[in-house]
Amino acid sequence: MIQRFRFGLPLPTDSVVQEIPVSAGPVPFLTAEEDGWAYRMAPDAIVYGLGEMPRGINKRGWHYVTNNTDEARHSEDKLSYYGAHNFLLIDGGAGRECFGVFIDFPGKVRYDIGYTEYDALRFATEEPDYELYIITGDDLNDISRQFRQLIGRSYIPPKWAFGLAQSRFGYKTAEDVREVARQYKENDLPLDMICMDIDYMQDYADFTVNKQRFPDLAALSAELKAQGIRLVPIIDAGVRIDPENPVCAEGLANGYFCTKADGTPFVAAVWPGKAYFADFLRPEVREWFGRQYKALTDCGIEGFWNDMNEPALFYSPERLKAFFESMDELSRKDNIVQDEFFGKVVGGALGLMNAPEDYASFYHDVDGQRVRHDRVHNLYGGNMTRAAGEAFARLRPGRRTLLYSRSSFIGSHRYGGIWLGDNASTWAQLLANIQMMPNVQLCGFLYTGADLCGFSYDTTPDLALRWLEFGLFTPLMRNHATDGSRMQEYYRFADMLPALRKMLRLRYALLPYLYSTFMKAALENTSYFRPLGFDFPADPDAREVQDQLLLGEGVMVAPVYTQNASGRHVYLPEAMKLYRIRSVDDYDTELLPAGHHYVRCALDEVLLFIRPGHAVPVARPASCTAQLDDTALTLWACPDENGSARCRMYTDDGETSDFAAPEHWKTLEA
């Protein structure tokens, strides 16, 4: 059951698609406080949700703020990342209630989940105008399903989007891109996508192509597509200020950009320097901006990634000028003391980026109402995704277009996926990737993944391999790195190349199961990844597991995420069949009883556990998804007590939007 409560005069967010009547009764489970709501947690209570946030699967023990942020350093001390996902799923503990809480509010929401008082959960919106949904059901899976129905079907990408994507900030020419494709082919490594960062643009301006570096983008796209590889270019939120650029000129002439208090366009700098920012909260602006993608779809482009759309701001001219003036004043001093150096010089420079004062200095038009940006800040990136998603429905009707974004809000999951932002090449970030996935998907973002190997810093060959051994299970599987870091395309690691090749081929072999699991999750509002406690709520050990995930109906994964480890502890809430896999054709199996185990797992092995009564369809590996044969399958299985094992498999053309036809489903029995 879903109950809806309204407070004040909420601004529209378009997060939900179901019309739930407003309830006049008391809010269940929660206690009203002066500035928000509270819930008293039992010692064994667990709090899931909040999507893209730091720390573990269980969010208890920390405080958070949903405030979409261009956060370059991912660490446990952070309060927010790129997405605002205000859904909590509370498992109250033995003999207590389970319920979901969705706070539909476009500004900051602050959470204290056992941080100040370990038995107290508190949350408060920055303004008194919001909607609150309370969801109850039979169990955690049922509550999750109801929430997903409330917010609408998750975005479904083309099937080729489940292949490997190779990306880097630093592919500067068409020949660089060709070389990546050539090396993958020569090293017999499967590949479906090459992502282009901002170097393909002319002067970092959206919807332009640098003709010297990429003289014929359409020909390059066609050349790679003939090899089964799609080009996936980036689009940033800031529109470069250039009166000669038709996108800038048209947006300015029609008043499509966000404005300052005096009505003039708001200006801030990002990669191209000074830029304007489209007012994505207006439908006509979304239609206009979405129309610009045609310049690239006309070149044969079928996929995009939207970036810098929190929106990230490097500086505003006004605050940069004030900073320079303060530095000029300091430069006249003979001695700059510690507080002045760290406070005014270092702090002043760092404070230019993503400054709260800048976010409070420009405005949107929301249904004819002028609204200051910081009040609706979290809607911005999601509405850029919406602009693109709605455009693709017009530009490529009946066809699927790949789209994923850095910034998001619940509701934008209907238009595109997300990647988990600018992580780092550390083992801690691998664990963070594992722990973030179920909560992100709980909030509707099914097509999700992290930058494999890590985006910043220099990765190591063993980290690249271990991360791939988890990444081969995530819907979005992309290797991405920043300019200046170690080159980390998989063919670069000579010593690890045989193992990396086998793991990439394993991903493609498992696609019949992974794609079927994804489509079931999207079409039936079930989960792709979920914590063990969802299926085993009465098992206290299962509820506490933070580093194993259930994958669909029939599989559990337990990645190795520590350096130099040759195995790991695994908890099985029921008997399962272990597949210790070195390649599609080289694996050991062992039936393990329920309980605690130490399982050996060499650096070139991955652990896959199949639950009783379930089977996993396995194809022959392929060089790209287009060459995958879904008809010649082997079944890996764990028969139940009756000796049977089965799976539901989904097959379609992978390109069109005809999802619901029943003939796409069939049952396979081992």
Protein language model regions, located:
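A conserved hydrophobic secondary-structure block that centers on an alpha-helix together
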Residues: 77-78, 154-157, 167-215, 219-221
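Extracellular structured ligand-interaction cores
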Residues: 82-86, 96-98, 106, 129, ...
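Aromatic- and carboxylate-enriched substrate-binding clefts and catalytic-loop regions
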Residues: 190-500, 536
